């Protein structure tokens, strides 16, 4: 049996507990890898996070921007197979690969999309499982066939070869679930995922990167730095990413744009579109979207295509003040 067919949807409501150990194939994710003598200095001059100070056993979020500070890619950066991996939504990589390689001809660096697979491990027993397949400690660990990276409490992403994936999937007793549950946890943790549809639209602070360790304001120059610094020191950022929740009578899928409106007095005005969404078995749904940062937390939202469905803003799991 093909290992990819072992992952099944797990219908549940917000009030139901999830299995203690779940494994999924995050098929919508991949990674860009970077090797070569100049990999560190080259990447340091391209991205918002500090590459030079990144330890082998830790990861960091980061963004790659254009010269105007608009984001091409949001990624999780970590050491992988003697180089770096920038793990991110697969749909963003086609454009991002071209942009991140733009000046590589002048450096000793090889940049490509990996053929490795992203496997997600989550649940109360996730850390214990990772301990069982690794011999080291830390938030980034070398494992058979690749690397295990902690992305939040009790949640790990494994970037591993096809062969290693088959062995992991067949040997693990974890509940094999669809990647929708991985995205559910991404939403709960308010982790920004930038797909192809959202590229080149937002500055990093509109996606909360300053609050989750994705921007270094003390490193040297990088592409788009002026805009990012101006947003911080002159207060020019007017947007933020929030968790939103409501109901839908239709199936919600990011394959179709999901737009929301916000109430303005007795009228409604376009608010934006969902960056990520997860739908429960009882038609409740939760998602992430970029909104104006001057909205009251109790402002009402609604689905543009289903105006009778009212949505609300939920609290973030972190402060939006810079770390």
Swiss-Prot record:
MF terms (GO), sorted A to Z: folic acid binding
Biological process according to GO: iron-sulfur cluster assembly; RNA modification; tRNA processing
Cited InterPro entries: GcvT/YgfZ_C, tRNA-modifying_YgfZ, YgfZ/GcvT, YgfZ/GcvT_CS, YgfZ_barrel
Primary location group: cytoplasm
Subcellular localization(s) per the UniProt record: Cytoplasm
Binding annotation for folate: 29, 182
Swiss-Prot/TrEMBL keywords: Cytoplasm, Folate-binding, tRNA processing
CC terms in the record's Gene Ontology section: cytoplasm
Transmembrane segments: none
UniProt record similarity statement: Belongs to the tRNA-modifying YgfZ family.
Summary of the function given for this chain in its UniProt record: Folate-binding protein involved in regulating the level of ATP-DnaA and in the modification of some tRNAs. It is probably a key factor in regulatory networks that act via tRNA modification, such as initiation of chromosomal replication.
NCBIfam families for this protein: PRK09559.1, ygfZ_signature
Protein name according to UniProt: tRNA-modifying protein YgfZ
Species in which this protein is naturally found: Vibrio atlanticus (strain LGP32) (Vibrio splendidus (strain Mel32))
Lineage of the species this protein comes from: Bacteria, Pseudomonadati, Pseudomonadota, Gammaproteobacteria, Vibrionales
């Amino acid at each position: 049996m093909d290992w990819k067919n072992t992952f099944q949807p797990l219908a549940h409501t917000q009030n139901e507990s999830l299995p203690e150990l779940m494994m999924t194939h995050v098929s919508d994710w991949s990674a860009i890898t970077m090797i070569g003598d100049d990999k560190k200095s080259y990447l340091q001059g391209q991205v918002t996070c500090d590459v030079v100070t990144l330890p082998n056993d830790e990861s960091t979020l980061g963004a790659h921007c254009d010269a105007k500070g608009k984001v091409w890619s949001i990624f999780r950066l970590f050491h992988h197979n003697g180089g770096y991996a920038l793990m991110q939504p697969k749909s963003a990589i086609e454009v991002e690969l071209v942009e991140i390689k733009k000046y590589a001809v002048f450096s000793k660096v090889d940049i490509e999309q990996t053929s490795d697979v992203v496997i997600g491990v989550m649940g109360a027993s996730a850390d214990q499982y990772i301990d069982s397949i690794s011999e080291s400690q830390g938030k980034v660990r070398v494992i058979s066939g690749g690397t295990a990276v902690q992305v939040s409490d009790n949640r790990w992403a494994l970037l591993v070869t096809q062969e290693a994936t088959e062995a992991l999937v067949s040997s693990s007793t974890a509940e094999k679930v669809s990647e929708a549950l991985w995205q559910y946890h991404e939403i709960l943790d308010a982790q920004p995922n930038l797909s192809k549809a959202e590229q080149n639209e937002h500055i990093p602070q509109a996606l909360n990167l300053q609050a989750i360790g994705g921007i270094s304001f003390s490193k040297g120059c990088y592409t788009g730095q002026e805009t990012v610094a101006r947003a911080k020191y002159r207060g020019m950022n007017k947007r933020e990413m929030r968790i939103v929740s409501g109901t839908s009578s239709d199936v919600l899928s990011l394959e179709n744009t999901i737009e929301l409106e916000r109430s303005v007095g007795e009228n409604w005005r376009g608010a934006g579109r969902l960056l990520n969404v997860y739908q429960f078995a009882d038609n409740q749904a939760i998602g992430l979207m970029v909104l104006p940062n001057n909205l009251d937390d109790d402002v009402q939202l609604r689905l543009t295509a289903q105006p009778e469905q009212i949505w609300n803003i939920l609290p973030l799991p972190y402060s939006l003040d810079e770390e």
